[in-house]
Amino acid sequence: DLEADLEKYQASIQNRPLHSIFIGGGTPSLFSAESIKLLLAEIQRRIPFSENIEITMEANPGTVEAERFKGYVDAGVTRISMGIQSFNDDKLQRLGRIHNAAEAKSAVSLAKVSGLKSFNLDLMHGLPNQTLEEALDDLRQAIELAPPHLSWYQLTIEPNTMFAYRPPTLPDDDALWDIFEQGHQLLTEAGYQQYETSAYAKPGFQCQHNLNYWRFGDYLAIGCGAHGKLTFLDGDILRFSKTKHPKGYLRGEYLYEEKNVEKNDRAFEFFMNRFRLLEAVPKQEFEYYTGLSQSAVKNQIDFAIQQNYIVETLDFWQITEHGKLFLNELLALFLDE
């Protein structure tokens, strides 16, 4: 089914090479290495791989064994992303995770000797009843394991989840700010560079898949619940998502919805993505990815500069610290009235 789903896009991508593959959504590490190898071979048979393709697979620390990791590397996986979330067993239980802190550390040890080019640890802060010291202790333990990449997210309560029905006591805004400020300092001192709102990496280890997404690049969506974006030769931009129901997917009902990104919405969508990254925004990329000229946003840009939301050079726009604090107001400037 994944192969048939992929086949539908072959004509649309005009033989463009793949620069990254992200195998996520649940626990793909339950797949055998043989299955992953087969999947990647089928993708490569249809779409060329770039020379330094990054192939990331999500893994649950509770489902990892040494042989499996080595098998994934042999199959072509270059990077593993592990959903650690916390090193505090009480907090992990509260989050409904199936692993404990000892298993998480064991999984990291295996990742280090498996031949992977890189690996990421997903960590959360702002957990129920979490103190500043507990949050920083999680970070210290993560830093000690020396992952090349760390994703450090604040817990958000999603609708229709256990926490949405029975809201826990979460740290207040002041406590969250202290956690972020002191945590950011810990990470920086340990040699990690923040390159996106929630992502830190050692130099040269940024996640290419992340970068492409936040730079408003294209990505295919293959499999249940996947979301994608494609730009066509005529300049049209299509966003699409796949059915969330495995039964429907197995019946060949792949597509859930698709919509064209109208020209009026492109500036907003572009900046909403780009301003998540800390790097400067090349003006040429605005034109390349949106198909719009810079003059289309001149008034909004001038106002944003006046408000100290961004600074401008001949070739770049850069969001300021002030702009990050007022991101919603900055983005609202680009909304189509």
Model-based region annotation:
Residues 1-11, 16-292:
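C-terminal scaffold of the Radical SAM
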Residues 291-305:
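Short amphipathic alpha-helical interaction segments
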Residues 305-315:
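A short, conserved structural fragment
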Residues 316-321:
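Minor-groove-contacting beta-hairpin "wing" of winged helix-turn-helix DNA-binding domains
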Residues 322-337:
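Short, amphipathic alpha-helical interaction segments positioned at domain boundaries
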